[in-house]
Amino acid sequence: MRSQSEGRPSEARSRLLDTATRLFYAEGIHAVGIDRIVAEAQVTRATLYRHFPGKEDLVLAYLNEVDRAMRSQADEAIAAGLPAADTIRALSRSIAQGIRSPGFRGCAFLNAAAEYPAPESPVRKAVLAHRQWFLDTVTDLLAKIRQTDAEPAARDFVMMRDGAMAAGCLFDPALICETFLRGVERLLQVHAATDIGPAWA
């Protein structure tokens, strides 16, 4: 019989995922064991394995939740109906806000990729799928400004975003965000122009 503290299965699953998300992001995936997740989520190991057959399944669920949150954030910005450049600015401000938030520990996907380097790893594949979605989203927005060189400009944006998120947990977040947002403005100006050369010129 399931204990009252575990609640309904959906509640137990939510507690497990919430606990894993908090610990994986703050301390690293490999650094956090199943026993600790079970203890802090206040469920049994049997309950965990009923919802997540293995730790990797829990890791994938964690990344899926982060992915869903970011897609929702992007969808909300796009749905506002602003010009494409302003939508990119809104996404950039949201990224900067995350970097400035307490407990920021970098990009969850880049962190996971560092812990799962094998190309055949399902976790690695989930990271790459998320990054491809993000690149495609930015490419589509930049193509609305100017079709030519939209994908190279999007790669520039993603690289700036990666750099800002990596540096944001090492140095002054305010300065990192200021630098990132200034770089985004420069990229938008260069991309909107014609025959001006690459964004780094």
Predicted features and spans:
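Basic, helix-initiating cap at the start of DNA-binding domains
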Residues: 1-27, 31-43, 56-60
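Cytochrome P450 catalytic-core helices
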Residues: 161
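Amphipathic alpha-helical segments used for helix-helix packing
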Residues: 101-121
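Amphipathic alpha-helical packing segments from all-alpha helical-bundle domains
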Residues: 71, 86-89, 119-144, 155, ...
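Short hydrophobic/aromatic patch on the recognition helix
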Residues: 42-52
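Hydrophobic alpha-helical connector segments
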Residues: 61, 75-103, 144, 154-157
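C-terminal peripheral helix-coil segments that are non-catalytic and often amphipathic
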Residues: 1-6, 129-148, 167-201
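Short, basic, alpha-helical segments at the C-terminal edge of helix-turn-helix-like DNA-binding modules
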Residues: 64-70
